[in-house]
């Protein structure tokens, strides 16, 4: 499954980047990527990746069977992080969850679409049947990326997530893709 990496991704306007799995040596680059994100992007992430200890833990405890992180690099820097989260046993072992974070300066070039497409392909190869993604309901560009990748909006949970900086609640959109229908 990972033998095809690294691979080049050609995006809109000829922009090119390299996709590959994260390795433990990515600590510095991954941390730089996360701290470069604007505060408005960071406030709705599930974890606080500006906490260096957290990123150190991610890089130290890599287990591709549970969390498969795919990075996009351009000119030596990380410009996107996408992760496929899986349960290895129990009632949810056929379902994966994906999370995608894209650097502001490379948005609107198709990188988000490409990262979602890449994780969907990896999930299918791993034998998963369904994928789930969550996005703040007001993040319409992100929701559109998922929908263009075959995800359906199945629910919107009202006032479900809280912006930890401004103490405001937001709605969250739940999107699902059925991999058995492709």
Predicted features and spans:
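Short acidic N-proximal helix/loop "leader" segments that mark the beginning
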Residues: 1-13
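Conserved GNAT acetyl-CoA-binding A-motif
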Residues: 116, 123-135
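A short beta-loop-alpha structural element at the N-terminal edge
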Residues: 16-29
């Amino acid at each position: 499954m990972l033998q095809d990496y690294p691979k080049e991704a050609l995006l809109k306007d000829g922009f090119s980047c390299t996709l590959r799995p994260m390795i433990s040596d990515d600590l510095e680059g991954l941390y730089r990527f996360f701290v470069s994100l604007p505060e408005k992007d960071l406030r709705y992430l599930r974890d606080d990746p500006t906490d260096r200890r957290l990123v150190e833990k991610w890089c130290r405890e890599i287990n591709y069977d549970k969390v498969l992180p795919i990075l996009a690099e351009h000119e030596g820097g990380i410009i996107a992080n996408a992760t496929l989260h899986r349960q290895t046993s129990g009632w949810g072992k056929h379902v994966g969850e994906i999370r995608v974070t894209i650097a502001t300066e490379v948005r609107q070039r198709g990188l988000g679409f490409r990262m979602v497409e890449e994780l969907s392909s990896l999930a299918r190869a791993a034998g998963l049947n369904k994928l789930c993604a969550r996005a703040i309901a007001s993040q319409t560009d992100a929701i559109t990326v998922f929908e263009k990748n075959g995800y359906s909006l199945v629910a919107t949970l009202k006032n479900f997530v809280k912006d930890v900086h401004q103490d405001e609640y937001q709605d969250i959109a739940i999107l699902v893709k059925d991999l058995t229908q492709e």
